[in-house]
Amino acid sequence: MIQNQPHFYRGRFSVAPMLDWTTRHCRYFHRQFSQHALLYTEMVTTGAIIHAKYDHLEFSPAENPVALQLGGSDPTQLAQCAKIAQQRGYTEINLNVGCPSDRVQNGMFGACLMAKADLVADCVSAMQTEVSIPVTVKTRIGIDDLDSYEFLCEFVQKVHEAGCQEFIIHARKAWLSGLSPKENREIPPLDYERVYQLKRDFPHLLMSINGGIKTLEEMQQHLQYMDGVMVGREAYQNPSLLGYIDQALFDPTCPVVTPREAVEKMFPYIEQQLSQGVYLNHVVRHMLGAFQSCKGARQWRRYLSENAHKAGAGLEVVEKALSFVAS
């Protein structure tokens, strides 16, 4: 069902933060499909921002609105990083309280922080002291045996009391041991109703739902109960879905953007990046799924995969790959 009036809540639709996937090049590509989608960075640790020589916060203003997802649990460091991010032009700071990987746990951030609501509250409070942009939290519905609805409500209430007004809830619990991050995205069952109930019990908070969402119809169903939906792998693997988002979820007067249009709009960006020494493959690897289910999609993927990594590969590789796709 197409909405009858514009909807402009910043987080009504967002693309999830995904490690190694939602790079600045990926976000720039996704922005060609949708002007309203909220895009997230990969998770960036506080240490990487404070100590690393590499600029982990580089992005183009044309990507906005973009949220920076931070990984960390030291309130002072998080506040420092949030301040830097706001100065750099990010529109939201998001704290990762959902990733269950061993590496993340060893750094004392991610899903394990659900068991430390007081610390999460301190982190949120410290960041909000330093920035005027929204500070949000992405979390799960529980961890290990701490998976009762009461536990979830207590966590949300405590973090809200510290000033957090927006939550993104992955509708699965996380197992902190015994499952890989991939398995934690698939094996724990989805419990959308629990997330709906959380929104009913905290109507004054803005809440988005995440986990297993793949179609516009599913998004519209969730939006009957939630303020926003967050989509991860489906948006990356089938980015043509993003071309319908503005019209279907924000403003019915917005045009649908086709994959070919989005790819062609990338040409100036690709040339700019090449001139700065960026390898073609670093940009176009995020574009392989652009024509999923279209005639010529396999040839598009194959040609890019076989040629974009070659020395001296330029825009002509993308143009040639595009010639295999039906107009």
From Swiss-Prot:
Signal peptide (UniProt feature, chain positions): none
Gene3D superfamilies: 1.20.120.1460, Aldolase class I
Family named by the database record: Belongs to the Dus family. DusA subfamily.
InterPro entries assigned: Aldolase_TIM, DUS-like_FMN-bd, DUS_fam, DusA, tRNA_hU_synthase_CS
Catalytic reaction list: 5,6-dihydrouridine(20) in tRNA + NADP(+) = uridine(20) in tRNA + NADPH + H(+); 5,6-dihydrouridine(20) in tRNA + NAD(+) = uridine(20) in tRNA + NADH + H(+); 5,6-dihydrouridine(20a) in tRNA + NADP(+) = uridine(20a) in tRNA + NADPH + H(+); 5,6-dihydrouridine(20a) in tRNA + NAD(+) = uridine(20a) in tRNA + NADH + H(+)
NCBIfam families given in the database record: PRK11815.1 (NF008774), yjbN (TIGR00742)
KW Transit peptide (keyword) present: no
Cofactors that this protein relies on: FMN
Chain positions recorded as FMN binding sites: 17-19, 69, 138, 170, 210-212, 232-233
An MF annotation (GO) of this entry: tRNA-dihydrouridine20a synthase activity
EC number: 1.3.1.-, 1.3.1.91
Catalytic center residues: 99
Disulfide bonds: none
A Pfam cross-reference name: Dus
Protein name: tRNA-dihydrouridine(20/20a) synthase
Keywords: Flavoprotein, FMN, NADP, Oxidoreductase, RNA-binding, tRNA processing, tRNA-binding
Residues carrying the site annotation Interacts with tRNA: 96, 182, 185, 298, 301
Gene that encodes it: dusA
Function: Catalyzes the synthesis of 5,6-dihydrouridine (D), a modified base found in the D-loop of most tRNAs, via the reduction of the C5-C6 double bond in target uridines. Specifically modifies U20 and U20a in tRNAs.
